[in-house]
């Protein structure tokens, strides 16, 4: 009797690094992490935590660099509307200002150091989120248009938080992080660059408002042309199941049958892909142009200025909308002057800073 011994086959060993790579790139996770997510997640947490702390409890910040600090936190007396994270002081300019560059924590807070910390980590987070969108689309075999559409708001945020301050020479010119601060930034940009008369801003308005109009129109047509699957005694919503393959609405009935009769029949949409393509492209291109407009005005390529009124044959001015806009812009310029505290009036700090004086010798 002979006995045969079979050598067991050795299982392939999987290293910890391979397991980590498999988990990072797996599309079966509840939330896809991805390689971009390794940078996005910590950057987003740092930005969000710092923003919440600064929004609630930050001390006053010398935004203009003239030792007249502005208080903007909730604990400093502001409310939800007026609270904001004040930009880094003009005394810092465009210098990178991490915590270890200041002599103390108080100095770092007084010069608006949290603002740089927030926006730089936030920009890293949103750009890596865009990359994460592309990465997941690639893993699933999808086309990259989702990431392309998201590039528009990413470009807009980059324009107001980084490109514009760099062009103007100081982070103090950036967008304050708050509701009142956003309106302050809008008025300041209008005062300095006449953005309402810039063609790129006009294209941005057309894209955003046009996209909103098309979205409202398409959504109302869809909900008005649902295919009836139930009797008139039951709600139309009970005839559908989430994720079903059959169409739930009649595109031709809504766009060609209804909208075509209201407008011009030949321009009514008869293809679902064309209407959804336009819904994505119009606001995306519009926001791209708006971001490009901020980028050009950052380097003082401003909107059109009509500094002289039209005159009639008698030499009297003919008042137009351009004159009204010029007067409003001049008023905003006065409001945005260094010593005028309109961001906002309730935000002026009561703290007094002692400024050393230099004696002047007279003969």
From Swiss-Prot:
Annotated residues for binding of pheophytin a: 129
The UniProt record gives the binding positions of a quinone as 218, 268-269
Query: Which organism does this record belong to?
Result: Acaryochloris marina (strain MBIC 11017)
> Which residues does the propeptide include?
349-363
Q: Name one GO biological process term.
A: photosynthetic electron transport in photosystem II
At what residues does the UniProt record annotate the site feature described as Tyrosine radical intermediate? 164
Name any one GO molecular function. Answer: chlorophyll binding
Q: Which reaction does it catalyse?
A: 2 a plastoquinone + 4 hnu + 2 H2O = 2 a plastoquinol + O2
Upper taxonomic lineage: Bacteria, Bacillati, Cyanobacteriota, Cyanophyceae, Acaryochloridales
Gene Ontology cellular component terms for the protein in this record: photosystem II; plasma membrane-derived thylakoid membrane
Keywords assigned: Calcium, Chlorophyll, Chromophore, Electron transport, Herbicide resistance, Iron, Magnesium, Manganese, Membrane, Metal-binding, Oxidoreductase, Photosynthesis, Photosystem II, Thylakoid, Transmembrane, Transmembrane helix, Transport
Q: Which annotated residues bind [CaMn4O5] cluster? A: 173, 192, 336, 348
Q: How does it sit in the membrane?
A: Multi-pass membrane protein
Q: What is its main location?
A: membrane
Which PROSITE patterns does this one have?
Answer: REACTION_CENTER
Q: Which residues participate in Fe cation binding?
A: 218, 276
Q: Where is this site: Cleavage?
A: 348-349
Q: What is this protein called?
A: Photosystem II protein D1 1
Question: PANTHER family annotated for this entry?
Answer: PHOTOSYSTEM II D2 PROTEIN, PHOTOSYSTEM II PROTEIN D1
| Miscellaneous note of the record | Cyanobacteria usually contain more than 2 copies of the psbA gene. 2 of the reaction center chlorophylls (ChlD1 and ChlD2) are entirely coordinated by water.
The cofactor note reads: The D1/D2 heterodimer binds P680, chlorophylls that are the primary electron donor of PSII, and subsequent electron acceptors. It shares a non-heme iron and each subunit binds pheophytin, quinone, additional chlorophylls, carotenoids and lipids. D1 provides most of the ligands for the Mn4-Ca-O5 cluster of the oxygen-evolving complex (OEC). There is also a Cl(-1) ion associated with D1 and D2, which is required for oxygen evolution. The PSII complex binds additional chlorophylls, carotenoids and specific lipids.
């Amino acid at each position: 009797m002979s006995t045969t011994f079979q050598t067991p086959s050795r299982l392939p060993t999987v290293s910890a690094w391979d397991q980590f790579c498999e988990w990072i790139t797996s599309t079966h996770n509840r939330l896809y992490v991805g390689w971009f997510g390794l940078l996005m997640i910590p950057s987003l947490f740092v930005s969000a935590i710092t923003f919440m702390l600064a929004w609630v409890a930050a001390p006053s910040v010398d935004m203009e660099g003239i030792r007249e600090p502005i208080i903007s936190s909730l604990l400093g007396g502001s409310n939800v509307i007026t609270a904001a994270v004040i930009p880094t002081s003009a005394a810092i300019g465009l210098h990178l200002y991490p915590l270890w560059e200041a002599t103390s924590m108080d100095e770092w807070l007084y010069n608006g150091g949290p603002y740089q910390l927030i926006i730089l980590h936030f920009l890293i987070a949103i750009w890596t989120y865009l990359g994460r969108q592309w990465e997941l689309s690639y893993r699933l075999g999808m086309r990259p248009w989702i990431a392309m559409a998201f590039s528009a708001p990413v470009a807009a945020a980059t324009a107001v938080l980084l490109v514009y301050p760099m062009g103007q020479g100081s982070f103090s010119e950036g967008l304050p992080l708050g509701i009142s601060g956003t309106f302050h930034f809008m008025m300041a940009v209008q005062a300095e660059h006449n953005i309402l008369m810039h063609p790129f801003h006009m294209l941005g308005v057309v894209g955003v408002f046009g996209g909103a109009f098309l979205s409202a129109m398409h959504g109302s047509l869809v909900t008005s042309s649902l295919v009836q699957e139930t009797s008139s005694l039951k709600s139309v919503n009970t005839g559908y199941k989430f994720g079903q393959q059959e169409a739930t609405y009649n595109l031709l009935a809504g766009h060609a049958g209804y909208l075509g009769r209201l407008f011009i029949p030949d321009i009514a949409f008869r293809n679902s892909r064309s209407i959804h393509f336009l819904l994505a492209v119009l606001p995306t291109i519009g926001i791209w142009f708006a971001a490009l407009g901020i980028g050009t005005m950052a380097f003082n390529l401003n909107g059109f200025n009509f500094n002289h009124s039209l005159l009639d044959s008698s030499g009297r001015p003919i008042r137009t909308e351009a004159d009204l806009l010029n007067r409003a812009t001049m008023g905003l310029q006065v409001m945005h002057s260094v010593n005028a505290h309109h961001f906002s009036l309730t935000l002026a700090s009561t703290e007094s800073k002692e400024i050393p004086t230099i004696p002047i010798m007279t003969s």
